[in-house]
């Protein structure tokens, strides 16, 4: 058995592969494929999303929380496969407890992602936990809107849920490039550009 894989960089055209040996007694094989992505690089059929939005104790009354519609739009913009995700907004106590329990760091951080896929064949599933007081403080310090910062951190979390990491410079550059492109497509500025004075 022979397996052949052809990648076509021009998503506007069909990819084709033809194997025709010099020997006229041999079999010719032709393979064509219809593009599965649009010219913008997004899937032709959007991935299915099962989304649960949760609010920890006392968090639902905070100002500036994104709506479910916004969250769904941001999640889908960074999604490359069908997924079941929970986006949870928490206070500093819950954020700190989770960070200490799962990462051994005794402080609240802006976003934590818990990805449940054990290998590449597993469906995308995960929890994205945002600590509201930290997100609010960072947005103010970075002179960006709270909406833009929530969008960035949700996109960041969705990428983590799909296996993206930033443990070294190469991974960080790749992930940041995807985040920047995704957020700009949503109408936000580059989240990594230097802070305005």
Curated annotation (Swiss-Prot):
Subcellular location: Cytoplasm
Binding of Zn(2+), residues: 156, 160, 166
Keywords, sorted A to Z: Cytoplasm, Endonuclease, Hydrolase, Metal-binding, Nuclease, Ribosome biogenesis, rRNA processing, Zinc
Stated family: Belongs to the endoribonuclease YbeY family.
Predominant cellular place of this UniProt entry's protein: cytoplasm
BP term (GO), one: rRNA processing
Cofactor: Zn(2+)
HAMAP family the record matches: Endoribonucl_YbeY
EC number(s) stated in the UniProt entry for this protein: 3.1.-.-
Job of this protein: Single strand-specific metallo-endoribonuclease involved in late-stage 70S ribosome quality control and in maturation of the 3' terminus of the 16S rRNA.
NCBIfam families registered for this protein in UniProt: PRK13963.1, rRNA maturation RNase YbeY
Pfam family membership, one: YbeY
Molecular function GO labels: metalloendopeptidase activity; RNA endonuclease activity; zinc ion binding
Gene (UniProt): ybeY
Protein name, per record: Endoribonuclease YbeY
Cofactor remark from the record: Binds 1 zinc ion.
């Amino acid at each position: 058995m022979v397996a052949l894989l052809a990648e076509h960089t021009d998503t506007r055209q069909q990819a084709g592969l033809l194997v025709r040996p010099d020997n006229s007694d041999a079999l010719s094989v032709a393979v064509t494929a219809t593009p599965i992505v649009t010219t913008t690089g997004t899937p032709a059929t959007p991935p299915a999303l099962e989304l649960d939005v949760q609010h920890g104790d006392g968090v639902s009354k905070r100002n500036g929380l994104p709506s479910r519609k916004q969250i769904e739009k941001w999640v889908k913009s960074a999604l490359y496969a069908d997924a079941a995700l929970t986006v949870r907004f928490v206070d500093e106590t819950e954020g700190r407890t989770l960070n200490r329990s799962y990462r051994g760091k005794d402080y609240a951080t802006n976003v934590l992602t818990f990805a449940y896929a054990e290998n590449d064949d597993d469906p995308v599933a995960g929890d994205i936990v945002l600590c509201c007081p930290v997100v609010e403080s960072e947005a103010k310090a970075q002179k960006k809107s709270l909406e833009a910062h929530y969008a960035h951190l949700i996109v960041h979390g969705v990428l983590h849920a799909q296996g993206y990491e930033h443990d070294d410079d190469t991974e960080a550059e790749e992930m940041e490039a995807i985040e920047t492109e995704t957020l700009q497509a949503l109408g936000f500025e580059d989240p990594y550009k230097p802070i305005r004075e």
